[in-house]
Amino acid sequence: MRSHNDFESITIRLASPERIKEWSYGEVKKPETINYRTLKPEKDGLFCEKIFGTTKDWECYCGKFKSIRYKGVVCDKCGVEVTHSKVRRERMGHIELAAPVSHIWYYRSVPSRMGLLLDMTVNQLKSVLYFEKYVIIDPADSGRNRGELIDEEEYHGYLDEYGDKFVAGIGADAIKELLARIDVDAEARMIRQKIQDKDKISDKRILKRLEVLEAFRDSGNRPEWMVLDIVPVIPPELRPMVQLEGGRFATSDLNDLYRRVINRNNRLKRLLALKAPEIIVRNEKRMLQEAVDALFDNSRRKRAVKGKGNRPLKSISDMLKGKQGRFRQNLLGKRVDYSGRSVIVVGPELKYHEMGLPKKMALELFKPFIMKRLVDLDLAPNIKSAKKKVEAEDKEVFDVLEYVVKEHPVMLNRAPTLHRLGIQAFLPVLVEGKAIKLHPLVCHAFNADFDGDQMAIHVPLTPKAQLETWMLMLSPHNILNPANGHPICGPTQDIVLGIYYLTSELPSEPGVPLKSFSNLEEVHYAIDRGVVEFRTKISVYHQGKILETTPGRLIFNTILPEGYAYVNRPLSDKETNRIIADVYDKYGPAKTVLMLDDIKKLGYRYATLFAPTISIEDIRVSPGKVGLVGDANKEVEKADSEYRKGIITNEERRKKVIEIWTKTNDLITESMFKELEKDKGGFNPVFIMAASGARGSKQQIRQLAGMRGLMAKPSGEIIELAIRSNFREGLSVLEFFISTHGARKGLADTALKTADAGYLTRRLVDISQDVIISEDDCGTEESISLGVVKEGENVIVSLNDRVFGRYTAEDVIDPVTDQVVYPRNTLITREVGQKVENLGYDKIRVRSPLTCESKQGVCIRCYGMDMARLIPAEIGEAVGTIAAQSIGQPGTQLTMRTFHIGGAASAKVQEKEHKVSYTGIVNNINGRLITNEKSQSVFSRRGSIVIQRLIQQYKTEELSNLRVENGQKVDKGELVATSPAGENITSEMPGTIHIENGLFRILGEEAVIPVKTGTIVNVKVNDITQPNQPLAEFDPYNEVGISEIDGTVQWMDLEIGKNVRRDEDLRTSNILLKVIEQRREKLNPRIAVISGGSREEYSVPVDAIISVQDGDKVKAGDILFKIPTVAEKTRDITGGLPRVDELFEARRPKDATTLAETDGKIEISGEIVKEKRVLYIHPDNPDLEKVKVTIPIGKQIRVRNGDFVKRGDQIDDGNLDPHDILRVKGVTALQVYLVQEVQEVYRLQGVHINDKHIEVVVRQMLRKVLITDSGDTSFVNQQQIDRLVFNEENKRVIAEGGSPAESVPILLGLTKASLNTESFFSAASFQETTKVLTDAAIKGKTDNLMGLKENVIIGHMIPAGTGTKKYKDIAVFKSAYGDLDRPLEEEEEEEIPQAIAEESDAEE
């Protein structure tokens, strides 16, 4: 067989009968396997030595030839060739079938390839193949068509009438004949002609048929090969038979399946020889067809063939499928030698790059190295005795072990390996005992703890492997998280506590002067004598100046690198991490690692000296709690009475109650924390643990000492009975019972969601695994715009954080001097980002993977910085896999998050008013305002309030000597004018100058506040507003419909009992009128308000509660109906993970919103078509047609007659459908939307993921285009094609003077995109294995082995990192004794450790 390294690509095709014979070494004629007495294979049976090769090395079946001397001799007596027994793994046989059978993959798969070629349905095919109906092959003059089905009677009728001219057949024979008669070229031409004549493609089946025909034409496959005359028999070692103790045999299911085929085939041969009646022969042929079906794909048949114990037998297809199949079990994941696993324990004495390796394990893992060393030192004469010495554990073995292990890195892995930091390399340090010792600071990366976790250890053997392990995987190279570039080695728990204690400060007594010291030694001496404590405030002479600090902080600062600014503040875990990141940035990884070890030592030491413990006395309940709970009870009572009077609905009451308790809980938490902070002078152990970030969170402590709060039901609904006790006071029985709900949900969720997150990661890896950095610069002109992320006016992500690690796509220009500060393609480091921010930019254009035009993978400039090392990415970096891991890994983390808070619900307090936290000026109020009875201005439709920050304001006469002009941008601290008194006036923050009406203003950014219908506005245009002044008030629980005129109400298409339900509340006797869905009737529910000649109509959606009766009088601004907003479910990644999933899978949401297809004016027609309302959009351009929009009756329409909409505006309520965004707004809008939405979910959980990782995945989802017009290209309409392949083909066609194809971009979800990759190996190993392989075989696909997965499957080195193609062509020059004369092969062979080579010789 060929070596697995001497090919670049693999093609898969249908096998012709000749090809199957070529593979075969002989025909299997008997169903026998082995002789049960001699246990030797039967001749001509399924294990026959003559066909498949000898079972014993260098020995024939009868024993005439025994020795390697006779290699290649074929025994004249038994016919067996003398050779290796290994050939039984590769030699195939065959079975000559007495009648052709159809291959199940090609007729039973959806869509059936055979059916498409013959233009028959699967059922029609089945009835021919299973001998139920005849198919016409040559109709003669009968007037019937070829391929039509007829029954037995008709067949005989036609035969009598037309004689031999009329040909029809039954069974696979007939199908084979039909397939052989197909002229693929002519048929394909005919269909293309048909499509062009039809103009628009109506029939999808025609297109599918064309695709299959052209696949056969281009691949060189013949259609009749889908029907088999010969069945190949796979090598016997791949379907083994083994003897169990007790003399029984275990055998592979395939042998049973082959046996059935051979039995039936032999029986059929006998029947044909005996010229048996047709009906018997047909039955046997049908059974043969079923036997072959079962052999190839047993699970696809309705009634699978069962073996012992009623278990379906595993067919060839089942061997490949699923997690236990060949692909995932044996090709993508293998067990490896030189590995071991053991429990881990903490190793506080280790350095960052070390791990403790138990001597017992080391002895076994390094065995060959030890044996070689023993022989080298003449401690053993040969390998065999060295082996005995090692097994006897002699004293000298341990001396040698120390030497062998020294500087030989090993890899540690903790399952589940969710990201690349789950495997890291360390230098082993030999330890006693049986547990592996792990450095405490690497735990976070492995997500390991010491409660019984196990880790696996692997030894890299060859020098090359050791070198890579050393250079790339050693733990000091992995101190940053590849997902975001933050340190992942930060201290946790005890260490944090120790550092916080060391750097905190006791309040100094007033009036007592500070003790002074002249240097660090004096301070140490004073501590030892007990004169000062670590946390006492002192003054000390340090680095040339007097400092007020504490001894603890002085000690901490000694471990920081030289020249680092003095840290004079208490350090929590976040602060410590910030310092680590800063040191990494300024001093590089080497200094950082040394500092980490020092932090570990300090932390442990001072945590031990501080020795905090928690007693029940430390959990202090705030004295104000009783009052707060009392107030809350009163408010709940008030809400109840409002409900009983009918002022509010039950749903509103429920929401109010939940909000009251949420607010109360927050207040209690606050007062409790204040109480804890005061306790013990700020050193209450519970408080310190939370404040330092060592253990526990505000949420958890609130449950210990505040109140447990609201709990959620398993459905995610919040129970309105709040738990008023905490764990310190103890819960009542009822409270305890309510608690169990949430706690149990937490545990169940954890189990389920972990699997979900794992599956999400698997799909992400599959779609993005072939994205590898392939070149330096793809030369694209495209780019994306990145800016500050804000929520309201709070900056969530600064510009510096967002653009960090990217390349600029345009020159960055100083707006004041107009000079280029940073040219295009500058890498944005922290400094560059800061400078850009200081120039006043709030967004800039940067290169992005989304717009990269590399043919394979992405380029360095579009990708930017490698977040794990903060240097530009290098060619060969597998950025796709890193992206997938970065998104998937937190998914799993987050799923486990619910578990720790114990199911306590976290609801958001609903805001009732719009306000901003700064002084502002109202620039505009967009929307329709009407004045109600109380003279308030009310929005009758959706609108917005535009407010601009007012930074400073002066009268112009108060200023002299203006330094700026109207409209100019100014920076913070920039001089804008001087006062008459000569004082300088500077800008307090970046802004824009605005001078008019005698006023000089510096204005900040505009904020647009969207406002819903029914909002009451408290401000006017040009008003100046104060911080937190209510600008507008609204009902947080309901959307409302408002009358715009005074008049009389008329119900239209609203009928009680049909589409209006009368709900009576039993507790209050209040009556609610609720609009319900009406399926059968064409009702268009509306409320009209009539006033004299004018009339306004308002559409009423499903679930609305009607507030007015037919004939009521209403005033402008009155509420006609309310729509309750959905109750807040608990906000948790349980909501989040499915959201990420649906975004990446590009699922269409259930109630998708409708987007305006064009700019224009709305006309609501009032027509109802198929339970949908019809609207029209009239474009501005009168030449264009009006656009028809249909909206389900039940949905609330956001627009009114005569409103102007822009392309892409939402016309009704609902969720955005990504496919609609792509169609209406284009690719860029969709990319931005997807990245933003995914980030939103993770940000809510406080998880940082760099945008570029999400962009890499989104890029893969948008790789395909859909052909709308094939032009002169080889594409078929409606075919999905890779964008790059499409562009190449179009270039080719244009160069030849043809007309190019046209296409639209399409969005594919993860699963679809993975199954549509160019590589069939990658797709087949992902999902739907048989379908992928069927398709690939027919198309004669070639896999160019570009991605990682397909290379792992084949057994090649992956084309990433040091395996990148460009590195393969490098020869190594050695300046030693002329060894460049030797060919490279010899070099390779020498790399095997000597001991292993010798050991294998010794065994032979």
Curated annotation (Swiss-Prot):
Cofactor requirement: Mg(2+); Zn(2+)
Signal peptide feature range: none
Enzyme Commission numbers on file: 2.7.7.6
Region ranges (Disordered): 1380-1404
Residues the record lists as binding Mg(2+): D449, D451, D453
Annotated Gene3D superfamilies: 1.10.132.30, 1.10.150.390, 1.10.1790.20, 1.10.40.90, 2.40.40.20, 2.40.50.100, RNA polymerase II, clamp domain, RNA polymerase Rpb1, domain 3
Record keyword Lipid biosynthesis present: no
Listed GO biological process terms: DNA-templated transcription
Binding-site positions, Zn(2+) 1: C60, C62, C75, C78
Group of enzyme by EC: transferase
Biased composition (Acidic residues): 1384-1404
Keywords tagged on the record: DNA-directed RNA polymerase, Magnesium, Metal-binding, Nucleotidyltransferase, Transcription, Transferase, Zinc
The UniProt record lists the keyword Transcription: yes
Reactions accelerated catalytically: RNA(n) + a ribonucleoside 5'-triphosphate = RNA(n+1) + diphosphate
Pfam families linked: RNA_pol_Rpb1_1, RNA_pol_Rpb1_2, RNA_pol_Rpb1_3, RNA_pol_Rpb1_4, RNA_pol_Rpb1_5
Co-factor remark: Binds 1 Mg(2+) ion per subunit. Binds 2 Zn(2+) ions per subunit.
Residues given in the record as Zn(2+) 2 binding sites: C778, C852, C859, C862
A single MF term (Gene Ontology): zinc ion binding
Quaternary structure and interacting proteins, as annotated: The RNAP catalytic core consists of 2 alpha, 1 beta, 1 beta' and 1 omega subunit. When a sigma factor is associated with the core the holoenzyme is formed, which can initiate transcription.
PANTHER family for this protein: DNA-DIRECTED RNA POLYMERASE, DNA-DIRECTED RNA POLYMERASE SUBUNIT BETA
Homology family: Belongs to the RNA polymerase beta' chain family.
UniProt function note: DNA-dependent RNA polymerase catalyzes the transcription of DNA into RNA using the four ribonucleoside triphosphates as substrates.
Database matches in NCBIfam families: rpoC_TIGR
Protein name stated in the entry: DNA-directed RNA polymerase subunit beta'
Species of provenance: Leptospira interrogans serogroup Icterohaemorrhagiae serovar Lai (strain 56601)
Lineage: Bacteria, Pseudomonadati, Spirochaetota, Spirochaetia, Leptospirales
